[in-house]
């Protein structure tokens, strides 16, 4: 349940003024105020993560859905989220979760989350659907418990995090999908996500990589506003120079949603041009996402071109690798962290009936203070 945050500092104790240090917005909050994300509240001069222990969405997914193609392929992950987000993307497909500003969710303490993950056959945890940095203290507690039982931790993040947040992330996170939009261009982010600057994302990428978190990158290619090939080239070059040519990069097809219904889906030819640009800049593992059946869902050996993992959507159809994860033709070592899980042959979407294990909690705004400080609940 609600817990005092790790990521904040007191600015003025006499005024009960605090600064949240989870994301680069660094919201400064007086008593009774909450941050942009909607779930980090100041009560009596302390910052609380009010959604700690409240998961709004939970499911067992294939890890490829994140997408993570090069980390523990074939595994099952226990996906979980809270409400809220540090961004306000106008095209968000999970807007009902990310833009919801209420304190609500299934009561899911870390021990129960891990217990359910293991009971339903998950190999790891994924913090996803909304931005995990805003509920990092909750994810951390779940992640530490998960590691006690041999489960790995991954997250899908916009990458918009502070140095203080990175220091927490690297204590328990094994892999991250960093979800760029429009090539990480700051003007695009200002227009569509209410984010002033994207530089913190690139700083975070370098630090996460340096500190041992396995990184894959997605880039949402949006027609008209976020499909410039010169910017794609600049991004690919930056990745090669700062993260390495073996970094997996996924160019995702945009579909109209939420407040952006007037744009078409990204033409497949546009995505293919992005692939060409990325390969020409030296990236060795590039993919097209949200186009099931496309040849660039597969993993190819960068040396000889052999298909070493064949995919259809989120499913793996065939794995053609040696035991030590090399191409069987030329012995090139494929950049895969962990191992390939034989569960790729199984159905990996699993519904979890949370109502059988716990209760749904919805706290009314006028009773939130008593709920956080005293555990009293009237809503």
How does the language model describe each region?
Residues 102, 127, 156, 217-218, ...:
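Residue-level detector of family-conserved "landmark" positions at structurally sensitive sites
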Residues 73, 106, 197, 267, ...:
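Short, conserved glycine- and acidic-residue-centered signature motifs
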Residues 42-175, 345-353, 378:
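Conserved Radical SAM active-site core
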Residues 1-31, 225-379:
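Auxiliary Fe-S-binding modules of radical SAM enzymes
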Residues 1-75:
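Flexible, acidic/Gly-rich N-terminal and inter-domain linker regions that tether
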Residues 110-269, 277:
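Conserved AdoMet/S-adenosylmethionine-binding subsite of the radical SAM
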Residues 24, 38-41, 86, 93, ...:
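Cys/His-coordinated zinc-binding microdomains
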């Amino acid at each position: 349940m609600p817990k005092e945050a790790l990521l904040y500092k007191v600015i003025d104790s006499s005024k009960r003024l605090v600064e949240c240090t989870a994301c680069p917005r660094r919201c400064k909050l007086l008593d009774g105020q909450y941050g942009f994300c909607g779930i980090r509240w100041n009560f009596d001069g302390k910052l609380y993560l009010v959604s700690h222990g409240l998961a709004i969405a939970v499911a067992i997914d294939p890890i490829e859905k994140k997408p993570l193609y090069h980390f523990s392929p074939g595994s099952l992950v226990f996906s979980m989220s809270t409400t809220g987000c540090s961004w306000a993307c106008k095209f968000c497909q999970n807007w009902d979760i990310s833009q919801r500003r209420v304190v609500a969710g299934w009561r899911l303490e870390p021990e129960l989350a891990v217990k359910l993950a293991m009971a339903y056959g998950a190999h790891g945890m994924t913090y996803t659907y909304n931005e995990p940095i805003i509920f990092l203290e909750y994810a951390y507690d779940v992640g530490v418990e998960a590691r006690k039982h041999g489960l790995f931790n991954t997250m899908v993040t916009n990458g918009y995090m502070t140095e203080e947040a990175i220091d927490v992330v690297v204590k328990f996170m094994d892999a991250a999908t960093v979800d760029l939009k429009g090539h990480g261009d700051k003007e695009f982010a200002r227009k569509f996500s209410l984010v002033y600057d994207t530089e913190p994302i690139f700083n975070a990428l370098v630090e996460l990589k340096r500190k041992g978190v396995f990184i894959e990158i997605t880039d949402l290619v949006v027609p008209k506003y976020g499909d410039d090939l010169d910017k794609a080239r600049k991004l690919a070059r930056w990745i090669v120079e700062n993260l390495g040519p073996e970094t997996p990069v996924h160019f995702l097809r945009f579909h109209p949603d939420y407040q952006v219904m007037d744009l078409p889906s990204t033409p497949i030819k546009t995505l293919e041009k992005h692939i060409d640009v990325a390969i020409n800049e030296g990236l060795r593992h590039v993919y097209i996402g949200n186009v099931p059946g496309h040849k660039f869902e597969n993993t190819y050996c960068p040396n000889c071109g052999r298909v070493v993992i064949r995919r259809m959507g989120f499913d793996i159809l065939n794995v053609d690798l040696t035991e030590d994860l090399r191409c069987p033709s030329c012995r090139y070592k494929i950049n895969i962290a962990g191992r390939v899980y034989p569960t790729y042959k199984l159905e990996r979407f699993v519904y979890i009936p949370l109502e059988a294990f716990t209760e749904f909690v919805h706290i009314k705004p006028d009773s939130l203070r008593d709920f956080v400080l005293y555990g009293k609940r009237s809503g």
